[in-house]
Structures are given as structure tokens and as C-alpha cells.
Amino acid sequence: MRPSLSDYQHVASGKVRELYRVDDEHLLFVATDRISAFDFVLDTPIPDKGRILTAMSVFFFGLLTVPNHLAGPPDDPRIPEEVLGRALLVRRLDMLPVECVARGYLTGSGLLDYQRTGAVCGHVLPQGLGEASRLDPPLFTPATKADIGEHDMNVDFAAVVGLVGAVRANQLRDETIKIYTRAAAHALHKGIILADTKFEFGVDIEGNLVLADEVFTPDSSRYWDAAHYQPGVVQDSFDKQFVRNWLTGPESGWDRASDTPPPPLPDEVAVATRERYIEAYERISGLSFSDWIGPSA
């Protein structure tokens, strides 16, 4: 269910977000409480999730010294009260058709690719790596953007060059690794491993590359507790991997290979996911989520 905002025209729906036109130069970027996994949007919302994602993005946009799409503070008067705390006023950009993924550790689809081919997105890796093996230096492992209900596809660097040209592809790779490295160092200082993350970039009217969408949220990143990190096993996480693990476990009764929609989440899984998202935000930012603006779920 999307917010009905009478003052603004709805222009697009994503898996988790809704986009509204503010004027010719600005959009309203609204994070809902929907959650997606394995490229499906689940039936069960996670209470306050949209506010947590927005709070985390605002924190990291402030921490990072790179151009981004924000066009005002999270309490900008142009943001309607009913979406306060889960919406951002952003600049219109020409978005690039690439998911820019940085991997500092081997897990998820990267691990599956490695187990099948010995490589990840064209990066040939040493033998003997396993779940949660550290990758030094971090890898740029891009993917194509998928529509709702379709699957993102990992691609190699040559495919990115084919999509956006060599100059822009090199820029995307370099910026992705630079931004990830900065954020990973910050998270580790707070006792959390930033295992991987994904970005989206756009281009402004002057041709400048701009960081857009969400950044370093528990939706777009994998966060692990550094104190309990152990290579070779699935890590306890502060992100939606918790939901993925339940869906692929015996309790859900769901067969991922069937390509049928996943079942609803039990209340206890939704509540635990909310708690993990909040813990990630509070530990990394040093702020209390109870102080974040907007109505709580």
C-alpha cells in the first residue's frame, strides 16, 4: 500500500519505495515498510522500516564527502507530515542502469557464483574460499537492475562498459570502492563489519556523477557483528539476511527454486527484523532511533 499524497503526483513504484513529483527539479523519495527478498516483495511489512532506512541514509549521506541527490533536510517543509521521517526531497537525475555492488566478504550470490565458476563478476579468485571469506581488496561486482518480480543479474565490468561507456564505467567502479571502503572503516570502528553493499548513481544536468537512492541501509548492505565474526559459517546479521535465512529454512515451507512467491513472515520474524535494523542504525550512527523524526508504526 502506498501513501496517498494529494499535493504531489505519484510517478513510480519500486520494490520498497514510492516516488512523487514535487516540481520540475525535485522528487519525493518515500521509503515504505515493505521488504523484498530474492526479488519478491513480501506480504508482511516490517514496522518502522521505512523510517529506519531513511535515518540510516541521512546519516551516511552526511558522513560521506561525495555529491548526493539530497535537496533538503529530512524535515524539509515540502515533505508532507504523513510521510515525515520516511521521505526525502531529492534532485531529479538521469539514473544509470547499473547496481554498483562492492564486496569485502564472500557471501550471497557472490559465493554462489564463486562455487560454480571460481570467479565473481569476472574476478577470478583463489581456491579454497568459503562463506564469509574476506576479500582484500574489495571487489566491484555490478549487477543489472531488475523490474519488480524479475531477478537482478550479476555481470562483469565489460558489461558495464557496454551499458554506460568506458569513462563512466571506470568512474562507477572507482567511486563504489572508495565509498564502500570509507563506510566499512567507520562501521568497523563501531564493532560492525560491512560485508557488502550496493549503490545506485545518477547523472545531473551538468553531467556530474551523483550518489542516489539509499546508502548503507540494512536493505542494501550486509552487516555483521565483528566480535562474533567467524569465516566459514553464515554470520549473524543486522540486515535482511535474517529474513532470507527464515525463508530458505525449514520453518517457512517455501521452495525458492519453485519461483512462487514466498509466504508471509510470522510476527516474531517481523519484530526481530525491526529490532536488528534499529540496532544496526544505533550502533553505526551513535544515535537513538527514538529521536528520529516522524510517527512510529
From Swiss-Prot:
It catalyses: 5-amino-1-(5-phospho-D-ribosyl)imidazole-4-carboxylate + L-aspartate + ATP = (2S)-2-[5-amino-1-(5-phospho-beta-D-ribosyl)imidazole-4-carboxamido]succinate + ADP + phosphate + 2 H(+). Keywords: ATP-binding, Ligase, Nucleotide-binding, Purine biosynthesis. InterPro entries: SAICAR_synt/ADE2_N, SAICAR_synth, SAICAR_synthetase_CS. One of its GO terms (cellular component) is cytoplasm. GO terms for molecular function: ATP binding; phosphoribosylaminoimidazolesuccinocarboxamide synthase activity. Pathway: Purine metabolism; IMP biosynthesis via de novo pathway; 5-amino-1-(5-phospho-D-ribosyl)imidazole-4-carboxamide from 5-amino-1-(5-phospho-D-ribosyl)imidazole-4-carboxylate: step 1/2. Pfam families: SAICAR_synt. CDD domains: SAICAR_synt_Sc (cd01414). One of its GO terms (biological process) is 'de novo' IMP biosynthetic process. Gene3D superfamilies: ATP-grasp fold, B domain, Phosphorylase Kinase, domain 1. Its EC number is 6.3.2.6. Belongs to the SAICAR synthetase family. This is Phosphoribosylaminoimidazole-succinocarboxamide synthase. It comes from Mycobacteroides abscessus (strain ATCC 19977 / DSM 44196 / CCUG 20993 / CIP 104536 / JCM 13569 / NCTC 13031 / TMC 1543 / L948) (Mycobacterium abscessus).
